[in-house]
């Protein structure tokens, strides 16, 4: 069941039946399976429920292009759960929602997207290496270039 559906309930039951130390190896295999699971959002939800924040952060960073920012009910708690120890992953979750909102013209979500952009700004000083995603300043400049005419959004950005 676990491998097909990423059921944390089934995995916990399975791990309880294993001898000491075998459970750690099985848990590592489960995390590896989650990292490669076809549905990145199901994998992220599993890793957050477990909880395995380091694995969730790794998933977000390695599969950032697959994230659907429309899934705010997943991305918001992911960003919250990861912000303290994994600010890069939290930033990527927030950016996925900002990008979706602006690219889709979801003006009803502008308030949230502006707040998310502010959260990204607050996380930025805690990120040592932005890798290939661009700094907060670079990201904000790119947003202005692509979505500068969305005054409803920019009027909410502080």
What name fits each language-model region?
Residues 1-158:
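Eukaryote-biased, non-catalytic alpha-solenoid scaffold regions
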């Amino acid at each position: 069941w676990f491998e097909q559906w990423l059921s944390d309930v089934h995995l916990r039951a399975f791990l309880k039946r294993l001898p000491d130390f075998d459970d750690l190896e099985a848990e590592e295999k489960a995390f590896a399976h989650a990292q490669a699971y076809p549905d990145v959002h199901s994998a992220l939800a599993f890793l957050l429920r477990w909880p395995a924040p380091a694995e969730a952060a790794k998933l977000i960073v390695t599969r950032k292009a697959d994230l659907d920012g429309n899934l705010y009910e997943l991305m918001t708690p992911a960003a919250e759960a990861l912000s303290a120890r994994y600010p890069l992953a939290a930033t990527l979750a927030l950016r996925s929602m900002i990008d979706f909102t602006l690219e889709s013209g979801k003006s009803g979500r502008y308030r949230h997207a502006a707040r998310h952009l502010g959260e990204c700004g607050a996380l930025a000083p805690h990120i040592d290496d932005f890798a290939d995603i661009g700094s907060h300043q670079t990201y904000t400049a790119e947003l202005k270039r692509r979505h500068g005419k969305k005054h409803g959004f920019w009027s909410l950005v502080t």
